[in-house]
Curated annotation (Swiss-Prot):
It catalyses: tRNA(Glu) + L-glutamate + ATP = L-glutamyl-tRNA(Glu) + AMP + diphosphate. Belongs to the class-I aminoacyl-tRNA synthetase family. Glutamate--tRNA ligase type 1 subfamily. This is Glutamate--tRNA ligase. A motif ('KMSKS' region) lies at residues 248-252. A motif ('HIGH' region) lies at residues 9-19. It is found in: Cytoplasm. InterPro entries: aa-tRNA-synth_I_cd-bd (IPR045462), aa-tRNA-synth_I_codon-bd_sub2 (IPR020751), aa-tRNA-synth_I_CS (IPR001412), aa_tRNA-synth_I_cd-bd_sf (IPR008925), Glu-tRNA-ligase_bac/mito (IPR004527), Glu-tRNA-synth_I_codon-bd_sub1 (IPR020752), Glu/Gln-tRNA-synth (IPR000924), Glu/Gln-tRNA-synth_Ib_cat-dom (IPR020058). Keywords: Aminoacyl-tRNA synthetase, ATP-binding, Cytoplasm, Ligase, Nucleotide-binding, Protein biosynthesis. ATP binds at residue 251. Its EC number is 6.1.1.17. One of its GO terms (molecular function) is glutamate-tRNA ligase activity.
Length: 504
């Protein structure tokens, strides 16, 4: 048997992180057994359809490195891979169920169904269709109230419907009794529950890997397989990703539920893959950092934890920092480019000068960022045009008072004659002038210099930053900062909350 698995997202908005989570485990299982991973778009709910959502699904899964073997954009032997392009597929199977007595027409109007549900709630009865239409012809049903000219088709759930089934993750699973599920809507579109079974069978899906919220639907899905004379696939119901309050993670409550949010926030795809794997899987040796290929090599359903994991972004931040620190410098520089372009610190396209400067600067921030987005703030002093450089108001107020003037002047005097403009030479000159010469502690000696050079109290390594900034720009910034300090500091320069100390 060739393993075939699928994910089947709906294009109803921004892709959900759960789509990536399910894709990861489907793909890992398929790769472990040399099988195929299928992407199917379930777009029959036209009321919620969003035009560009399908492309976002493609782009976000590919960004995450979770590519598929067959799908709408690739084709394959079991296409088409959009449900809306398969509508002629479903009706013959509905007719087969009607003919065999496993389904029936229902002419109840939406108003009649709403009133029925309200009455069931009032009487504290289990919800479900009351079978008013079952066994009646259209004419017989039309004589009763709440009639609709446009019928739906419902499954006829037998009294002895099996409610247990084997699951690859959970063992033997019990589910609640289903009611008479609609399988064909009044507009002629199949419902999810019917289309998913037909499509999975016709696409030769051998294993259905999906979230635990579908456990309650599995008995009716299994009935459809049996009634249509099809072999059952095996099921694996994954634990749901949950918020810290244990509620299901949703885009309404948690921005991290949006798959695109992770790219926007500067997470690496390999870090997010690792994190999503940890949400449901443990490696045999207990390690937390592992690649997708390492996960595939060890993959076994017995290692999936059925308990819903809490989506802890703090752990993801730690993993992301680890992966950033592990990148080759040129790779890191390349990945920083779109975020620096978004911040308008480098151009599009990147100039040769910008490219060289970025590759030299990337090591300065590699140990200091947990997100790629954080590099823009740290490197702005280096990449921004000199006429746009400014000192943060808080840094100016706290550091560039009159007592900083002497150390800044001493720094200028020490650096002006320096022939070797390298980080080590800059460090030695400032150490001799400020620490040895003025008797200052290193923190007090170098902080005014840091603020003068970078505009911030927290920055990449100071001496390496000055080397990249260059002699002329470094000395010019020191002179401007010294002038601010000579004038009585930031207060004398008219700096207040929300303003900035310009150094031009």
């Amino acid at each position: 048997m060739t393993v075939r698995v699928r994910v089947a997202p709906s294009p109803t908005g921004d892709p959900h992180v759960g789509t990536a989570y399910m894709s990861l485990f489907n793909l890992a299982f398929a790769r472990r057994h040399g099988g195929a991973f299928v992407l199917r778009i379930e777009d029959t709910d036209r009321s919620r359809y969003v035009a560009d959502s399908e492309q976002q699904i493609f782009d976000s899964l590919r960004w995450l490195g979770l590519d598929w073997d067959e799908g709408p954009d690739k084709g394959g032997p079991y296409g088409p891979y959009r449900q809306s392009e398969r509508l002629d597929t479903y009706r013959p199977y509905v007719d087969q169920l009607l003919a065999s007595g496993h389904a029936y027409y229902c002419w109840c109007s939406p108003e009649r169904l709403a009133a029925m549900r309200e009455e069931q709630q009032r009487r504290r009865q289990p919800p479900g269709y009351d079978r008013l239409c079952y066994g009646k012809t259209r004419e017989e049903r039309a004589r009763l109230g709440g009639f609709s000219e446009r019928p739906v088709v419902r499954m006829l759930i037998p009294d002895d419907v099996p409610l247990t089934f084997p699951d690859l993750i959970r063992g033997q699973v019990s589910a609640p009794r289903p009611d008479d599920q609609v399988i064909l809507k009044a507009d002629g579109f199949p419902t999810y529950h019917f289309a998913v079974v037909v499509d999975d069978h016709l696409m030769a899906i051998t294993h259905v890997v999906r979230g635990e919220e579908w456990i309650s639907s599995t008995p009716k899905h299994l009935l459809l397989y049996d009634w249509l004379g099809w072999p059952r696939p095996q099921f694996a119901h994954m634990p749901l990703l949950r918020n810290p309050d244990k509620s299901k993670i949703s885009k309404r409550k948690n921005p991290a539920a949006r798959l695109l949010w992770f790219k926007e926030q500067g997470y690496l795809p390999e870090a997010l893959r690792n994190f999503l794997a940890l949400m449901g899987y443990s490696m045999p040796d207990g390690r937390e950092v592992f690649s997708f290929d390492e996960m595939v090599a060890e993959f076994d359903w017995s290692r999936v934890n059925p308990v819903g994991p809490v989506f802890d972004v703090t752990k993801l931040d730690w993993l992301n920092g680890h992966y950033i620190r592990s990148l080759p410098v040129d790779d890191l520089a390349e990945r920083l480019i779109p975020y620096l372009q978004e911040a308008r610190l480098i151009g599009t396209p990147v100039t040769p000068r910008e490219d060289a400067l970025l590759r030299a600067a990337a090591p300065l921030v590699q140990e200091r960022i947990a997100h790629l987005t954080e590099a823009a703030e740290l490197l702005a002093f280096l990449l921004r045009p000199e006429e746009e450089f400014g000192i943060e108001p808080d840094a100016a107020q706290r550091v560039l008072g009159r007592d900083a003037a002497a150390s800044l002047r001493a720094a200028i005097d020490a650096l002006e004659p320096l022939a070797d403009w390298t980080a080590s030479a800059i460090h030695a000159a400032l150490q001799a002038a400020l620490v040895d010469g003025l008797g200052l502690k290193p923190r007090h000696a170098f902080t005014p210099v840091r603020v003068a050079i970078t505009g911030r109290t927290v920055s990449p390594p100071l001496f390496e930053s000055m080397e990249l900034l260059g002699r002329d720009r470094s000395l010019a910034r020191l002179r401007r900062a010294a002038a601010i300090a000579d004038a009585g500091g930031a207060d004398s320069a008219g700096v207040g909350p929300g303003s900035a100390v310009r150094t031009d």
